[in-house]
Amino acid sequence: MNKVLKNSWALFLGMGFIMMAYGFQGSLLGVRAVQEEFSLTATGFMMSGYFIGYFIGAATIPNIISRVGHIRVFAAFASLASLIILVHSILIHPFVWFLLRVLTGISMVCIYTVAESWLNDRSSNKNRGSVLSIYMVILYGSMGVGMFLLNFSAPKNFEPFILVSVITSAALIPILLTKKKPPTFKKINAMSFSELYKSSPFGMVSSFFYGTIQSALFTLLAVYATSMNFTILE
């Protein structure tokens, strides 16, 4: 267990930065959308682009990793995510932001796939649950810290967008400097939804409802709070 954690510290640190930026970005865009007077329909449409990108990325990422490897994929899509948030601050329109959210979704699912396949390869059946639980604590803890960074500067300014980009870029440093070899890519045949349901009906159904609730909370909670005249600190 300790050996796995020692060999994966760069990945944990990199994902901590990624999720800090992700948590910051989600709250920032929600608050800014209200300040720009986007309609609720436009805001919901814009924020849903992330999950459309998630589906697209999930279908394409195995082929990309098989061609260029884990580290290059992580670096490329973290760089793309860093670039995208800066474009948000320049082109302020619901449809443009929707397209940018699609690209963000693609980037994030690629990053998640690299991280979780890496950890899965490094761990065994005996310690995989413990390793992944630490990974999840880091993810959600970092996301919470990122949301608090909304107090750094007013969402109307450029500075919060720049800070998200800086944090995302910082995630590249430990990953690119690690001496540990990435896992060998093992391409697995995709499962259909019916096959997945037969394999784990409870897991599939519970994941669907969990994702529905989580996506609403993480994407629209800041919108609701701002509409109810909560302060940024609150």
Feature map (PLM): residue ranges:
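Residue-level signature of mid-helix packing/kink "hotspots" within the transmembrane helices
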Residues: 51-59, 143-144
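Helix-breaking motifs and short loop linkers at transmembrane-helix boundaries and internal kinks
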Residues: 69, 90-93
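C-terminal membrane-cytosol helix-exit motif in multi-pass small-molecule transporters
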Residues: 150-151, 165-185
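Cytoplasmic helix-loop-helix junction between adjacent transmembrane helices
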Residues: 102-137
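Helix-to-loop junctions at the C-terminal end of transmembrane segments
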Residues: 57-70, 154
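Paired small-residue
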Residues: 95-103
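Helix-loop boundary and gating motifs at the non-cytosolic
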Residues: 3-51, 200-203, 207, 215-224, ...
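Structural signature of the two symmetry-related core transmembrane helices
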Residues: 72-86, 165
